[in-house]
Amino acid sequence: MKLTCMMIVTVLFLTAWIFITADNSRNGIENLPRMRRHEMKNPKASKLNKRGCREGGEFCGTLYEERCCSGWCFFVCV
């Protein structure tokens, strides 16, 4: 019985702690589903697509490396 009460109190305390310490900025948890829907409608809006890529003639390394804007790499971006 004591263990059950301690577990309930612990869960309530941790739940309250999460709500107290949660980030309350504009891009918080409440806006996350809205942002994800926007990214699904417009995949180019995703932050992952905004990575820097290398232009033609720059050193890239190995074959077909994703760092080139064109997607083709043979030691330099093609």
UniProtKB/Swiss-Prot annotation:
Subcellular location: Secreted
InterPro entries, sorted: Conotoxin
Gene Ontology MF terms in the entry: ion channel inhibitor activity; toxin activity
Organism superkingdom: Eukaryota
Keywords of this entry: Cleavage on pair of basic residues, Disulfide bond, Knottin, Secreted, Signal, Toxin
Disulfide cysteine pairs (residue numbers): 53-69, 60-73, 68-77
Pro-sequence residue ranges: 23-49
GO CC annotations on file: extracellular region
Major subcellular location class: secreted
Entry comment describing in which tissues the protein is expressed: Expressed by the venom duct.
A Pfam short name: Conotoxin
Signal peptide residue numbers: 1-22
Domain statement: The presence of a 'disulfide through disulfide knot' structurally defines this protein as a knottin. The cysteine framework is VI/VII (C-C-CC-C-C).
Family statement: Belongs to the conotoxin O1 superfamily.
Protein name as annotated: Conotoxin 5
